[in-house]
Amino acid sequence: MGLRLSFMGTPHFSVPILHALLDAGHDIVAVYSQPPRPAGRRGLKMIPSPVQNAAQAKSIPVFTPQTLKTAEKQAQFAELAVDVAIVVAYGLFLPKAILETPRLGCFNAHASLLPRWRGAAPIQRAIMAGDKETGMMIMKMDEGLDTGSIALSRSIPITDNTTADELSNKLSHIGAELMIEMLSTLEKGQLKLTPQSGENITYASKIKKEETRIDWTKPAEFIHRQIRALSPFPGCWCNMNIAGREERVKILGSRLTKGPSREIGWIEPNSLIIHCGQGRIEITSLQKSGGKILDSAAFLRGARLSTVF
């Protein structure tokens, strides 16, 4: 017999864990997700989150409050009488009253090796920092920012070409496996929790808009990490001189290349090899504003480039 759960999550990253819990036979009596967001040019269409769509496809009741800080919303949550709340990239603050309501507690799946990269963007920050490994951790939540005691963890390597999208997909599925294992152990009364270390704490703040623009005076290795960390969303960008006209282009894929250096921003003829402040980088995937995502060969067939800036 499975546990009575509530699930709290918002992006695509959370969906495999929701599906895994259902497949394991747990009774998810309610799903919480952030409210639908406006989309389209005029913002007239409201788009539900991936988690809301997934829950509704399984006929699970969905709640999308703007906040959980009010007595009304906390009472509504208490009425669910859940054993455990599972939290995966929900994005809303859980006050003490919510944390203390489930019979066995609130458990969070976090995509880093805590206490490194506490906060909102652990996958992106790990890649941008050049970390060689990261992982997934299941922790019992407390009132701090990702400070809870650890129930389970698993580490994986970050290669020199791993993108945030690839890493997110891997960690999400690892998180699903760990969450099922954790709940099984918890249900048997055998779960052991380990407090986090007080050393080597770092914070993964949200990605700022200014961090998405490529500065070609930076080393090629730095730019390569930046592109990988922000691919596919929000994506890095730069301006390109295409047939004498300045155009904004989103850069979604790259690789480091060796060779002699030239002035910063120089593009090798018939290629997308760009010279940086130190070293060179080859752009492998990019997208003009309003256009399709293209590989470098397809892009070059329709563009005459001179410089980037």
Swiss-Prot record:
GO terms for cellular component: cytosol. One of its GO terms (molecular function) is methionyl-tRNA formyltransferase activity. It comes from Bartonella quintana (strain Toulouse). The gene is fmt. InterPro entries: Fmt, Formyl_trans_C, Formyl_transf_N, Formyl_transf_N_sf, Formyl_transferase-like_C_sf, GART_AS, Met-tRNA-FMT_C, Met-tRNA-FMT_N. The lineage of its organism: Bacteria, Pseudomonadati, Pseudomonadota, Alphaproteobacteria, Hyphomicrobiales. Attaches a formyl group to the free amino group of methionyl-tRNA(fMet). The formyl group appears to play a dual role in the initiator identity of N-formylmethionyl-tRNA by promoting its recognition by IF2 and preventing the misappropriation of this tRNA by the elongation apparatus. This is Methionyl-tRNA formyltransferase. Keywords: Protein biosynthesis, Transferase. Pfam families: Formyl_trans_C, Formyl_trans_N. It catalyses: L-methionyl-tRNA(fMet) + (6R)-10-formyltetrahydrofolate = N-formyl-L-methionyl-tRNA(fMet) + (6S)-5,6,7,8-tetrahydrofolate + H(+). It comes from the Bacteria. Its EC number is 2.1.2.9. (6S)-5,6,7,8-tetrahydrofolate binds at S112, L113, L114, P115. Belongs to the Fmt family.
